[in-house]
Regions:
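Long, contiguous internal "core" modules enriched in hydrophobic/ aromatic residues
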Residues: 1-212
Length: 212
């Protein structure tokens, strides 16, 4: 049976770092970083970069070096998130415009409006999930609540705001090819490429957001 690791408080973790052969140049600074960002996020996530083939830390490795890599990675994630959000906003705007223009702002969540080559059951399941999300947000999201109470439906340009990037990607995939092409044309790429980009963006965004 694998022995469960015992809890160590920040001071104990600081000493544990030293026993691993990692150089600590400033006890107070290192302790604050452990408290603020967690030992696991800093050491466990990046330790392999600084270890040799014997699974021991390379000679001369300092905590500051490991933390610098953690900081670099964190800042890189923030950059990715910033530009993914920009692209997401653009796609949402164009997508809602295409759907509204071609299918109206009321009856767009109908199976016949989507790709006929996709199984109707799968499309209906996706539409049901979108409708469930609308119902869930009713009473919580101001715009959703307003449109349901006043008009009895939610237009695409409002719905699009509550969809995650993953849900947005699925909605785009369900569109008829001619509609996907109208969206992708705005980015000067094919609908096939945009579909793949959206899937990749969803994966990268989730990794960055959850610090995996």
């Amino acid at each position: 049976m694998v022995k469960v690791k015992e809890y160590k408080n920040p001071n104990e973790l600081l000493e544990h770092i030293k026993t691993k052969g990692i150089i600590v140049l400033d006890n107070n600074s290192t302790l604050e970083k452990i408290k603020k960002y967690s030992y696991y996020s800093i050491i466990n996530s990046y330790k392999d970069v600084f270890k040799n083939s014997d699974n021991e830390y390379n000679e001369g490795v300092s905590f500051d070096e490991i933390f610098a890599l953690y900081e670099f990675d964190k800042n890189l994630r923030l950059i990715f998130l910033k530009y993914i959000l920009e692209i997401e906003i653009n796609i949402k705007s164009i997508l809602s415009e295409v759907i509204s223009a071609n299918y109206g702002i009321k009856d767009y969540l109908i199976v016949k409006n989507y790709d006929e080559t996709i199984d109707e059951t799968l499309i209906q399941e996706s539409i049901d999930k979108i409708q469930d999300e609308i119902n869930k947000q009713n009473g919580k999201h101001t715009a959703i609540t307003h449109y349901i109470n006043k008009y009895g439906f939610v237009p695409p340009y409002v719905l699009i705001k509550i969809l995650t990037l993953g849900e947005l990607s699925k909605l785009f995939t369900m569109l008829k090819q001619i509609d996907r092409q109208l969206v992708s044309k705005e980015f000067k790429i094919s609908d096939k490429l945009l579909k793949q980009i959206m899937k990749n963006m969803t994966l990268v965004r989730n990794i960055c957001a959850h610090n995996d």
